Design a protein with these regions (language model features):
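A short, compositionally biased domain-edge/stem linker segment
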Residues: 1-2, 173
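N-terminal beta1-alpha1-beta2 module of alpha/beta enzyme domains
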Residues: 3-81
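Internal, glycine-rich beta/alpha segment that forms the wall or movable "lid"
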Residues: 49, 60-61, 85, 89, ...
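Structural motif corresponding to the early beta-alpha repeats
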Residues: 72-80, 86-95
């Protein structure tokens, strides 16, 4: 990924962390040593064996999609192995996540990495994966919006609650 901050172009790498790929801590350390600005990792909670959703890249689903690590756990390892490298989700599948747990994971990773976390989000492409999480794919954008609003409240307020169509929780500390 490339992005511009002010007048400076920054360069990052995208990685599918799996149990048979390069160790994420070693990769992060190597990227930082070579002057990269960031490391982004994907998210899939699971890939249903029987799918209605075709792979967006066409053809067969690559093996790496079948065995991805949790992005927050993987990025925690990368954070521990580096000092300056920014760490990001590319993307975090918000419709499939509990907003309270996700808000806690995001805040914890950002704090423990000294503010190096980049939270990139999306709705996803795999209809079957969404449905397994109880999400109607046609409403995923509405679900994303509401969950993000709930998480923003948890990050901004000492005692935050939320009441909506998809998210409901009483004022809580998080």
């Amino acid at each position: 990924p490339l992005w511009i901050t002010g007048t400076v172009m920054q360069v990052g790498a995208f990685h599918f962390p799996t149990d048979y790929g390069i160790d994420i801590a070693e990769l992060a350390h190597a990227l930082e040593a070579r002057g990269f600005d960031a490391l982004f990792v994907c998210e899939h909670t699971h890939i249903p064996v029987s799918r209605k959703s075709p792979f967006p890249g066409g053809g067969e689903l690559p093996k790496k999609y079948k065995h991805t690590h949790d992005p927050f756990v993987a990025l925690s390892f990368a954070a521990a192995a580096t000092r300056k490298l920014k760490l990001g989700t590319g993307i975090c599948l918000i419709p499939q996540r509990d907003p309270i747990v996700t808000a806690k994971s995001v805040a914890s990773l950002d704090q423990l990495s000294n503010g190096r976390f980049i939270f990139a989000i999306g709705g996803g492409w795999n209809v079957d994966e969404m449905e397994h999480h109880g999400v109607d794919p046609s409403r995923r954008r509405d679900v994303v919006r509401e969950k993000v609003l709930a998480m923003r409240g948890l990050w901004a307020e000492d005692e935050a609650g939320y009441s909506g169509d998809f998210v409901e929780f009483a004022p809580s500390w998080s």
